[in-house]
Regions:
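Terminal alpha-helical anchor/extension segments at protein ends
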Residues: 1-264
Length: 264
């Protein structure tokens, strides 16, 4: 629910920025190109007649220079937009979505620094001057949901590959034990599962079994261990994959890919 998305919708002259969340989107300050060639089109009549020093300009040379200047202005503008996006991403955004008409969105992605590309989840075909915050919110969150599902399915595949070599654990109690030891790199959670349990009093670890908390202080009942396991994993800077549908049936409610191999 706390997911924040920075959405950038750009053309060659301007860019609009939106702060997007699950329940809405707010428009932020935009970026405008300071030196756009607002004449718009090349007029060949501007290039007729002799050039300085005698002779005539080569046919089409004026139009070539004009188009080249347009391309250079566009590249400088997109670089400024990308720089602004990168600075704003430091303000706690989880993901980045870009939009534009035609190839503009892909052109903007090319200017992003590699350090922020892992937060880029997709590009949208949008008219920068017409798009509304409501449309941005719906389209951006659809991209985020698709990205999350693809990432979760990839995590399940990696889990299945690593399980035989003890680089992963399956099942609630085994996974909670790995989490208590700080072993979890990626936590896999079945979206539709609910597991009541306990948080042991002195150790603070989670367990499905009251008996397993014996000797660790007064246990605290937990309505759903999976929610608390997600919070513990995030505090340990582990990745969390909430898995929906058929892929969730490939593990037992809770599983983990480990930071280091389990001992025999």
């Amino acid at each position: 629910e706390g997911t924040r998305v920075l959405a950038v919708v750009a053309d060659r002259r301007s860019a609009r920025f939106f702060d997007v969340g699950l329940f809405g989107a707010a428009e932020l300050d935009g970026v405008a190109a300071p030196e756009s060639s607002r004449g718009g089109r090349f007029h060949s009549a501007q290039r007729t007649g002799p050039r300085q020093g005698g002779g005539h300009a080569a046919p089409g040379s004026g139009e070539y220079r004009f188009q080249n200047r347009i391309r250079e202005e566009k590249e400088r503008h997109l670089a400024r937009v990308a720089e602004s996006a990168q600075a704003r991403l430091r303000s706690g955004y989880d993901f980045l979505v870009v939009g534009g008409i035609g190839v503009e969105a892909d052109a903007l992605v090319a200017h992003l620094h590699p350090s922020v590309r892992d937060r880029f989840v997709g590009a949208l075909q949008l008219a920068p001057k017409k798009v509304t915050p409501a449309e941005i919110q719906v389209r951006a969150m659809e991209l985020v949901a698709d990205h999350a599902q693809r990432s979760a399915e990839a995590a399940v595949e990696e889990f299945r590959e690593r399980l035989p070599a003890r680089w992963a654990v399956d099942g609630v109690e085994s996974t909670l034990g790995a989490l208590a030891r700080g072993q979890v790199r990626t936590l896999l959670v079945d979206h539709d599962a609910r597991v009541p349990g306990y948080r042991c009093g002195t150790s603070g670890r989670l367990s499905e079994s009251l008996a397993l908390c014996r000797g660790e202080g007064e246990p605290m009942p937990i309505a759903d261990l999976l929610d608390d396991a997600i919070e513990d994993a995030l505090r340990q800077r582990a990745n969390v994959a909430v898995v929906r549908g058929a892929p969730a049936r490939r593990f037992d409610r809770l599983a983990a890919i480990l930071r280091f191999q389990m001992a025999r």
